[in-house]
Amino acid sequence: MKVVSLFVDQKPEGEQSIDRAREFGFSVYPTIAEALRCGGDELAVDAVLSIGEHGDYPTNEKSQVLYPRYEFFKECVKVFEEDGRAVPIFNDKHLSYSFEKAKEMVDDGHRLGFGVLAGSSLPVTWRLPDVELPLECEIEEGLMIGVGGSDPMDYHAMEAMQCMIERRKGGETGVAAVQLIDGEEVWKAGEDGRWSLELLEAALSRSDTPCGLTDEDGRTQDMIGNGEIYRLVENPSAYFIEYNDGLRATLLMLNGAVRDYCFAAKLKDASVPVSTQFFLTPTPNVTYSACLIAKIEELFETGIAPYPAERTLLVSGTLESCLTSRLQGHIRLETPHLDVEYRAPAESQYARQ
């Protein structure tokens, strides 16, 4: 598998595309169309890898960076339509800051018959412990812990949660409503039972990076019981997601409590929650990215996405609506447009070796 052409949208000081092209023998073109045609008159590549990240791009009122992922994608689609042939596209991370644009991207893949894959590396990295929810399991509630800023780290956490709960009985049905709250209201919502303290405890138990007392002297701790979590997390956020089939799930962004991403769920008739950590291997290796690259290679070789782009579509839209909730005063928003239905793959596709 070879890189044969490249388009670079921005070239700040230190940008290495020309050096890499010289080293590895590919060409850099001034437009996406020319890159896809390798300077010729028709589509001349077997697949497209689109990375809309980094760079100097504007931010909207929801604090979303307006990366041109949709625009890159549509430039590719234009070439496919003009040349009468389409090839698979991988789109790094969320499809777009806009659900409307993201849906058009997925629809283009179905319309023209090419594979579309997108998303985070978290769903395909290792899990500690190795947990795969049974397909068609009955989930009563789900909870995810994430860290980092919004947007994009809440996106990564939300997609990790989605890859677990999409395996529930009946498949994915879409999202009926969302609400995002911040600060002390998050803890009050937990006390009131809006999200499960039991699931938070189960998720925290999988973290390898508890902060506070563990950082200070290595002791183990019950962060909820001793109250340490309330001291450590200065500005928690809770993303409440209500699904069309009645399932409720919560993403808690808890900067200061832990440094990793952990999930817990209550399954019907189970006496204790199931929980796991989405393992992020340390720098400089960051081998969880290699797990995602393996799935990209599978898409490119077979033309078939190993898991549906509808997962990323739903997460893209859910996150957008959550950020709209925050912007509009943390109100609950009904989301009839997020009626995205799909089935999870039989195997979860995460790394096991």
Feature-to-residue mapping (PLM):
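Phosphate/oxyanion-binding active-site loops and adjacent basic polyanion-contact surfaces
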Residues: V65-F73, S120, M153-D154, N285-Y288
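Glycine-centered short loops/turns at secondary-structure junctions
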Residues: G113, G329-H330
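Viral RNA-dependent RNA polymerase
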Residues: M1-V4, D9-P12, R20-R22, I32-E34, ...
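N-terminal glycine-/serine-/threonine-rich beta1-alpha1-beta2 phosphate-ribose binding loop
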Residues: M1-P88, K101-E104, H110-L112, E166-D215, ...
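Short catalytic/ligand-binding loop motif for oxyanion handling, primarily in non-cytosolic enzymes
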Residues: C38, D56-T59, Y97-E100, T125-R127, ...
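A contiguous active-site-proximal alpha/beta segment in oxidoreductase catalytic domains
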Residues: K74, G84-I165
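Contiguous beta-strand/loop segments that form the cofactor/metal-binding neighborhood of enzyme cores
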Residues: L143-V147, H156-T283, A290-E310, L319-L323, ...
